[in-house]
């Protein structure tokens, strides 16, 4: 690895430390308190004259004023000033602090607590130690890394210099733990299903393919966990859920990353109306837990999770917005003629169902700001959902939409094995016609359904998009620690 000039200067300082018998990367520390604890208990510790040892990264500039020096160090819990006097710490370590230590080095400082003349809580250092010498200097503006792509490529540096980014991921962890507790308290059992699958299914998406050398078998990274969880419902578990990574070989944009986190849950003897109530309760709980209120702000919109969510029917909304009655135009060519006739600016799609979805996505969904259940999806887009008894072109399905963004998907699950087989066959014909997102025939899943699956409601929630909402982040990359990035040129 070639070092630039600044790295070489830091390497020379590291070598000086080693030459003096100082290990710049010792195996352990003598830390007695976190910085956050010291700050919270500062006056009591100071009154007792208690000696503390804190540890953290040097942040900001070090200042040397004759026989005095000071800097700030930071650990995960907080930031505190350390104050060094040549008389207290001795010539060797005072000079070493001045000459061999740098911003971003990780140190430990032992001393007593006092406030400066300006009242700033400080550790007056009696002993200093090096815990990790940083060979990389901070960015030019140490207090912030502003290049978005570099922030995502070097998330470790982003976390060092932008404390608010750490807060986003603390909130993410809180959302996941709250969601898990919410489901546990309602009797759902957390389970684990295969990541490597011989047949991919449960969503309309292109998979990532890998190969098992010993079995000489192609396998797929899961695009969803639905079909395995429904097998468990067949097996007698009545409420199950899984929080897991799923993988879809698709584009990268503001709301899509090829690797993302989903929560899927299934409840026997329930339908999509029960899942709607579950979603309302879940997001209300998340809002109260994360924001302390049912109201949040996302990208300038005030979102209220307190009231019941509105319901919007796809055919009704499209008719109101565009004048097109999709239930009267149930073939692709007449629908596309109507699109051209009224001058809709949408991409033309290869199937009726996808064309309906395109119209809705462009002309209706962006206007759905308050929490909304979008219902009445075409059966052609929903091969795993139960048909509406009164309208066989549509299914009992909803998508929760917040601030114009889809955050999940839910059905009354199709449990008729004969109907399911026909849906799979239709998907196979679509695949043969060029739809590489069509779902695959899964004989074993059909066999499971033939043993009988009770009426079941199923729900999938995108964790990443949910975190976007509750942290007011404009892009999914801001809520994934290590998002997928294009290779450097």
Curated annotation (Swiss-Prot):
The keyword Cytoplasm applies. One of its GO terms (biological process) is lysyl-tRNA aminoacylation. Binds 3 Mg(2+) ions per subunit. It is found in: Cytoplasm. Mg(2+) 1 binds at residues 399, 406. It holds the Pfam family tRNA_anti-codon. Its cofactor is Mg(2+). InterPro entries: Aa-tRNA-synt_II, aa-tRNA-synth_II, aa-tRNA-synth_II/BPL/LPL, Lys-tRNA-ligase_II, Lys-tRNA-ligase_II_N, Lys-tRNA-synth_II_C, NA-bd_OB-fold, NA-bd_OB_tRNA. GO terms for molecular function: ATP binding; lysine-tRNA ligase activity; magnesium ion binding; tRNA binding. It catalyses: tRNA(Lys) + L-lysine + ATP = L-lysyl-tRNA(Lys) + AMP + diphosphate. SUPFAM superfamilies: Class II aaRS and biotin synthetases, Nucleic acid-binding proteins. Its EC number is 6.1.1.6. One of its GO terms (cellular component) is cytosol. Keywords: Aminoacyl-tRNA synthetase, ATP-binding, Cytoplasm, Ligase, Magnesium, Metal-binding, Nucleotide-binding, Protein biosynthesis. Its main location: cytoplasm. Gene3D superfamilies: Bira Bifunctional Protein, Domain 2, Nucleic acid-binding proteins. It is an enzyme of class 6 (ligase). Mg(2+) 2 binds at residue 406. Homodimer. Belongs to the class-II aminoacyl-tRNA synthetase family. This is Lysine--tRNA ligase. It comes from Roseiflexus sp. (strain RS-1).
